[in-house]
Design a protein with these regions (language model features):
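Flexible "arm" and connector segments at domain edges
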Residues: 1-147
Length: 147
């Protein structure tokens, strides 16, 4: 499954954002912050999925902020990571994937079909004029109105 997921993401990027390097390299700060922002957007959607009221959403975001501050404190306390930056980035992304799959396990959901649906939908992000539209700040591929 990992190869299939990587190949799907690679196909998306080759079509919409063909910047795959010839050799492994770290993400530069701007790209790193954009990727973290994309992940945070999805995490917040997940976090509020059980919320029925705006008050619950506000409470959820308070809890997210509390946990972010705790994570920051943990990082500040343990000191700088001595591994190469690319190792740190790859390890963190691997942990995110592993935790995501663990969440599927706890839900009793095989994600294969869901991930295929997401990939197929993402490959349809061309606008009616046949072009890709991007966010001016993050360079994220935008969804057409019909999407």
């Amino acid at each position: 499954m990992t190869n299939q997921l990587y190949n799907q993401a690679q196909a998306f990027h080759r079509f919409f954002d063909d910047r795959e390097p010839a050799a492994p390299k770290k993400l530069q700060q701007a790209d790193l912050m954009n990727r973290v922002g994309f992940i945070l957007e999805e995490l917040t959607e997940l976090a509020v999925s059980n919320c029925d009221k705006e008050e619950e959403i506000a409470q959820t975001f308070q809890e997210i902020n509390r946990r972010l501050l705790a994570a920051k404190e943990k990082i500040m306390t343990k000191g700088m990571n001595q591994n190469d930056v690319i190792v740190q980035q790859a390890d963190s992304l691997g942990d995110i994937i592993y935790l995501s799959f663990g969440s599927y396990v706890l839900m009793g959901v095989d994600p294969t079909e869901i991930l295929d649906i997401i990939h197929n939908a993402n490959m349809q992000k061309l606008f009616p004029d046949g072009t890709v539209h991007r966010d001016k700040v993050t360079n994220k591929v935008l969804k057409p109105v019909r999407w």
